[in-house]
């Protein structure tokens, strides 16, 4: 009966019937091979693609009911992490965190534990729970990590510190990290603490050579350039404003931020309060396009924490 249900894609009834059979008849000669078949069916549902056709909640419900069938080793870990990714995509962050928390506690060790712990920390940050993010990192410390994974964990720890109100410690945590991800985090910290003189050079690094190849600026590039000139304006960094105007004066006119760019980089004697008003106007936009959002974007093209696997 269980196999018939499975053949009809009724996975819950099928696995339920097979579970009853092996539970009620533990000494039957068919129990051992049937148990292996049940475990394989569970694996195939979640790895072979059938679970992808379910809603994330239905997939989670099926997993929770038959969790004991999760294979040991990498295939089982793959099931858990894939399900967690799907839950994150629909903002079921608490449920995703619980899955990975169990994985950290009971399934993985060493560098793999550190990697999954970083994923768990990221979910907690996305869920606005920085203390839990720090706890996840502390619970998954392991020696001998690769440089990429160690740096990613460091950035997550810095983000959690900042979200808990300790901007200085967060900046110290990443002071040796020269990566773009670290600069995005620095820019966000300086922006939100209104440390304009410190923000401007970081945004300038992030802007880099955008638009110098003759291509038009997309909205994201234009916003990054605007954040640079807002920071430079608020810190009265005329050198940076002149550089930005010379480099991007023409190309920024064709973007939604052209008027703001013109005000920030122009030679007029506008009231400084206009600059402050504009900076506040774009503050929330600047924050959205920052550290955590870059991770959310990566969910669309790969598994959660893809940047923490090195």
Residue ranges and their predicted role:
Residues 1-310:
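Acidic, polar-rich low-complexity tracts and alpha-helical solenoid repeat scaffolds
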């Amino acid at each position: 009966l269980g196999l018939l249900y499975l053949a009809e894609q009724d996975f819950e009834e099928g696995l339920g019937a097979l579970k009853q059979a092996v539970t009620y008849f533990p000494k039957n000669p068919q129990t051992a091979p049937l148990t292996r078949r049940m475990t394989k069916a569970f694996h195939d549902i979640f790895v072979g693609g059938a679970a992808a056709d379910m809603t994330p909640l239905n997939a989670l419900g099926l997993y929770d009911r038959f969790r004991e069938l999760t294979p040991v080793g990498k295939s089982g870990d793959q099931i858990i992490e894939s399900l967690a990714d799907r839950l994150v995509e629909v903002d079921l962050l608490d449920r995703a965190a619980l899955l990975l928390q169990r994985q950290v506690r009971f399934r993985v060790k060493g560098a793999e534990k550190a990697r999954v712990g970083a994923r768990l920390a990221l979910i907690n940050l996305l869920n606005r729970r920085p203390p839990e993010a720090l706890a996840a990192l502390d619970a998954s410390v392991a020696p001998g990590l690769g440089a990429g994974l160690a740096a990613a964990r460091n950035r997550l720890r810095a983000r959690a510190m900042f979200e808990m109100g300790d901007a200085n410690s967060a900046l110290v945590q990443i002071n040796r990290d020269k990566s773009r991800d670290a600069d995005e985090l620095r820019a966000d910290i300086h922006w939100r603490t209104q440390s304009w003189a410190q923000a401007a050079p970081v945004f300038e690094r992030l802007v880099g050579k955008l638009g110098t190849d003759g291509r038009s600026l997309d909205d994201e590039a234009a916003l990054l350039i605007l954040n640079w000139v807002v920071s430079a304006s608020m810190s009265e960094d005329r050198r940076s404003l002149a550089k930005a105007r010379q480099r991007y004066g023409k190309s920024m006119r064709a973007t939604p931020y052209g008027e703001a760019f013109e005000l920030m980089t122009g030679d007029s004697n506008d009231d400084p309060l206009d600059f402050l008003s504009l900076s506040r106007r774009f503050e929330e936009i600047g924050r959205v396009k920052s550290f955590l959002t870059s991770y959310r974007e990566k969910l669309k093209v790969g598994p959660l924490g893809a940047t923490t696997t090195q």
